[in-house]
Each structure stands twice: as structure tokens, then as C-alpha cells.
Amino acid sequence: TGVTYDHRALVIDGXXXVLVSGSIHYPRAASSWYAVET
């Protein structure tokens, strides 16, 4: 058991897992992308 990594993914307990993450910078994004109608 353990966590290691190779050139493509994390390897958790022998199974490859790919983590995908991101963020949005609201001041740089068009307001229509995140506008909420009330």
C-alpha cells in the first residue's frame, strides 16, 4: 500500500489515478460565464 507516481499519473495501491484540477479567476472571466440570475 502506498502512493507513488510515474510519468503520467499517481499510483495509489497499485491502481493508476489521474487527478484533474483547475481554477477560474472571476475578474478575468466574462461575466456571462458565471452570472447567476436572481
Swiss-Prot record:
Gene3D superfamilies recorded: Glycosidases
Principal EC category: hydrolase
Keywords, ordered alphabetically: Glycoprotein, Glycosidase, Hydrolase
Catalytic activity: Hydrolysis of terminal non-reducing beta-D-galactose residues in beta-D-galactosides
MF terms in GO: beta-galactosidase activity; hydrolase activity, acting on glycosyl bonds
Subunit structure: Heterodimer of a large and a small subunit.
Miscellaneous remark of the record: There are three forms of the large subunit which have the same sequence but differ in charge. There are four forms of the small subunit which have the same sequence but differ in charge.
Name assigned to this protein: Beta-galactosidase
Organism expressing this protein natively: Hordeum vulgare (Barley)
High-level lineage: Eukaryota, Viridiplantae, Streptophyta, Embryophyta, Tracheophyta
